[in-house]
């Protein structure tokens, strides 16, 4: 299943994927690699490195005005994925157009992160590279796009990450980016050690030199070395970040940062095509805002979806018969208010229109569970009675009443009780086209959303029970 809808919201390819027909008509080199199916659909063979390279070069030219060269024996980046990372860095550092300074660890032959960052946002980059071929291509790509004033490509020794690259620097950088080698050995690179044997093979080709795709210990150990460097550099960079090819690497790396006492940590997901990547970022600055991880965003989105049930037209008509001269929404709302009063759930009306009414609820005690238990107990007791009992004599009744302790009347919830509420929610009662009435319960805040689920079920059942009572 394609993941394009989960791309970063600012990614230009999120809602408008590349138009292969248009690109093929404009760029002859790209046109060589497109294929037309029997149904007339234009496709690209993503297992062909030349086709992937043609697409990358074409998109960079068409959408960013960049001209680059990439050798087939080195890593060929996909533009939507790299763009996701750039946009996330924008979120970390708090701006798209501000002049910022960044470091790209292992920039690759394409030098794609610095080229995109400089072109889109005017960022300054220090781009490091250990491989001779990648270094030469990266320098050439920077020069032919006239970006040498913004991007400095430097050749560094093997296993150099941040410490050696910055030993002669005194500048404070805003961020670093890194696309580390994902694999520890050839078997991993070929997918032999996949944790899921049922996982389908990759839909795209895996190009790249040895230093680009493999490192001792794989990406886990590589990123731990970046963390080790960051512990020495600390505030020389505002944000440290690394991309990850395996989700299973995320938890141990977060644990490592926690052990080292790093408080500002966040992560994200990069979704594109059929590929997912993850990224981790951390900072030693107290004043940097930390973007929410995607899982928290999804929980917030899920929380916004209301619980609903529908009161059908026939049921609404019965309610209206019992409450004359009232609209469908007014009848349903009035019955809901009666039930809520019986349950001792605080509620008040919120101004609304003719076709929609709203109630704001504050639950301070779980009375609906007690109500259900009480009904069950009454039913069980009635079933166990052998015969109808004689009504108590007036004398007995008076005696029992005298023996009962004084029970104070129910008092409304005080301010202290309201401070310790179970949850608050907004109930919307809406009339639909077929004269049905829709009841929505929107979570506002509280201890546990399951409590609102229980109350929703209780309201629905109580409403229908009242309608079903013989008149």
Swiss-Prot record:
Region of interest: VCR 1: 284-390
Superkingdom of this protein's organism: Eukaryota
MF-aspect GO terms: mRNA m(6)A methyltransferase activity; RNA binding; RNA stem-loop binding; U6 snRNA (adenine-(43)-N(6))-methyltransferase activity; U6 snRNA 3'-end binding
Protein name per Swiss-Prot or TrEMBL: RNA N(6)-adenosine-methyltransferase mettl16
Role description: RNA N6-methyltransferase that methylates adenosine residues at the N(6) position of a subset of RNAs and is involved in S-adenosyl-L-methionine homeostasis by regulating expression of MAT2A transcripts. Able to N6-methylate a subset of mRNAs and U6 small nuclear RNAs (U6 snRNAs). In contrast to the METTL3-METTL14 heterodimer, only able to methylate a limited number of RNAs: requires both a 5'UACAGAGAA-3' nonamer sequence and a specific RNA structure.
Domain notes: The VCR (vertebrate conserved) regions bind the first hairpin of MAT2A mRNAs. The VCR regions interact with the internal stem-loop within U6 snRNAs, inducing the conformational rearrangement of the A43-containing region of U6 snRNA, thereby modifying the RNA structure to become suitable for productive catalysis by the methyltransferase region. The K-loop region occludes the S-adenosyl-L-methionine-binding pocket. Upon activation, conformation of the K-loop changes, allowing S-adenosyl-L-methionine-binding.
Similarity remark: Belongs to the methyltransferase superfamily. METTL16/RlmF family.
Chain residue ranges for the region called Disordered: 375-412
Chain intervals for the UniProt region annotation (RNA-binding): 17-20, 194-206, 245-249, 272-278
Chain residue ranges for the region called VCR 2: 421-470
Annotated catalysed reactions: adenosine in U6 snRNA + S-adenosyl-L-methionine = N(6)-methyladenosine in U6 snRNA + S-adenosyl-L-homocysteine + H(+); an adenosine in mRNA + S-adenosyl-L-methionine = an N(6)-methyladenosine in mRNA + S-adenosyl-L-homocysteine + H(+)
Region (K-loop): 159-163
Regulation of its activity: Methyltransferase activity is autoinhibited by the K-loop region that blocks S-adenosyl-L-methionine-binding. Upon activation, K-loop changes conformation, allowing S-adenosyl-L-methionine-binding and subsequent methyltransferase activity. mRNA N6-adenosine-methyltransferase activity is inhibited by zinc.
Residues given in the record as S-adenosyl-L-methionine binding sites: 82, 106, 110, 129, 160, 179
Localization, UniProt: Nucleus; Cytoplasm
Cited Pfam families: Methyltransf_10 (PF05971)
Major place of residence: nucleus
Gene3D superfamilies recorded: Vaccinia Virus protein VP39
Secretion signal, residue range per the UniProt entry: none
Any one GO CC term of the record: nucleus
